Amino acid sequence: LAANQIGIEAEKAALDRGVGSQYPAAAGVPELKKEASRFVKAFLNLDISPRACVPTTGSVAGSFGSFIACTQRIPGKDKVLFIDPGFPIQKSQLRIIGVQWEEFDIYAYRGAALHDKLESMLSTGEIAAIVYSNPNNPAWICLEEEELQIIGELATQYDVIVMEDLAYFCMDFRRDMGHPFEPPYPPTVARYTDNYILMLSSSKIFSYAGQRMALACISDKLFDRQFPALAERYKDAGVFGPTLIASILYMITSGCTASTQYAYAEMLRLSTEGKINFVEDTREYARRAERMKKIFTDNGFHIVYDYDATQVVGDGFFFTIGYGNM
């Protein structure tokens, strides 16, 4: 889909104001941080302070930096758990930094069955972070409240950070979501734990992928938590949020493009005010997926991940197909 025109115009205006001559602050421009906090309140009904809403150069950079911080914060707690199917790039990131991971496919562990499987992996004490996308890339399954509660409560119990990738935010088109300050709100693990990092990308909801802009929205409690191991490694205070921003993310991308931050801020602001309906803007993906799936299933293919825990998987950005045993 075409990039959101409001973002384009806001970015042009920022460049015309001269922001291209200035280094952006490592923590992000204040306008974006403010609008990110408002957006999270409007569309998730969560309270995250602006200081804990951190711009990243796409969610790929956000996850890369978060993996580093999560796996270095507690000695011996240094593996990542993927709830698959997932985003292969994230495993490639772990190869770069030499971090090991565990994984399991969610298909056989939907609903209450998730609890024992997840606890068996967290109870080793080695898992530092859990990663998944919701809706899922590539299966388009959506974790439900019961499952997110299990993940959140076990994350608290075993001191694990949940990295929840919300790239396809509000794109479960089976539900009427995306109305600012009105339920229903998308399900999120953030209702069940303070150990979370939410990754919100502009790439899909505003079709702004070319400009590489996202947010890592960190719970305030995690943002302010002090870890002696981080302090020792980075020779700073060891506080999670500031260390992630100044000692890790800045070393990867040296901040985020200033003009694009202003574009994202404006798109978030107008969404929160009800002047951009990004859910309707992206609903075309569901219409296309429905037609494509019918073409495949009419010709002998089947949908591999066909059910969520309690309902048929929806139509959206991705779907998975098989043919016979393939």
Model-derived regions, located:
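Conserved core of the PLP fold type I
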Residues: 16-158, 163, 169-192, 197
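Short beta-strand segments
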Residues: 82, 131-133, 163-166, 200, ...
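Conserved PLP-binding catalytic core of the aspartate aminotransferase-like
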Residues: 282-326
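N-terminal "arm"/small-domain region of PLP-dependent enzymes with the aminotransferase-like
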Residues: 1-24, 42, 160, 250-251, ...
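Short, solvent-exposed loop/turn segments at secondary-structure junctions
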Residues: 1, 60, 87-88, 108, ...
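Short, intrinsically disordered, charge-balanced linker/junction segments flanking boundaries
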Residues: 1-2, 122-125, 232-237, 319-326
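Conserved core segment of the aminotransferase class I/II
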Residues: 9-12, 191-283, 296
